[in-house]
Regions:
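C-terminal segments
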Residues: 1-85, 89-91, 98-182
Length: 182
């Protein structure tokens, strides 16, 4: 089954559950108190931290038993960096939380609301005026990319960059890729 945002999706039976990057989440918990959020936004940010803690496939594995008794395992890998495009501070922070919990570095443009907090997020957040040149493989588009920007991404040399529509929030499971080992 595909890992997408659908109400019917059921998590696979895991022999080893996903493990969030707790160090990154602790740093983000500290940052929540510095961000200019009102009480309702702080509650939403805290909920995003809790959600990221349990909804990750980082270091998760499931065992698939073959018909002749062989042991096959299925695990997932994530990219090193994902570009978060657009959104307000709360939306961008929620996407950062999902990515950081999965051990993924977030790349933003200098005009992103998160960019001014890059000193507090060293190693978790990278600011780059040309994110497509920062070794990204995915774009979490909180706001739709302009057609010019899409043309620019399509016309560049190298691997394709996958655009993840994230207007309703980033679904971290879309970022992971299956790896099967026998």
């Amino acid at each position: 089954q595909r890992l997408v945002r659908t109400p019917e999706w059921v998590a696979p039976t895991l022999s080893r559950i996903g493990q969030a990057d707790e160090d990154a989440l602790k740093r983000l918990e500290t940052l929540v108190h510095k961000l200019p959020f009102n009480a309702e936004e702080k509650k939403t940010a805290a909920a995003a931290l809790g959600h990221a803690r349990v909804r990750t496939l980082r270091k998760a594995e499931t065992v698939l038993v073959g018909p002749t008794g062989e042991r096959n395992s299925l695990s997932w890998r994530s990219p090193k960096r994902v570009w978060v495009h657009g959104g307000n501070l709360l939306q961008a922070f929620s996407a950062l939380t999902e990515l950081a919990a999965a051990g993924i570095q977030t790349v933003v443009e200098p005009n992103s609301p998160l960019a001014s907090y890059s000193a507090d997020l060293d190693g978790l957040l990278q600011v780059n005026s040309k994110p497509e040149n920062a070794g990204i493989s995915h774009v979490a588009a909180i706001e739709p990319l302009s057609s010019e920007r899409k043309q620019e991404l399509a016309g560049r040399d190298g691997a394709l960059i996958r655009i993840l529509p994230s207007e309703q929030g980033l679904d971290i499971l879309q970022v992971f890729e299956e790896i099967s080992c026998s």
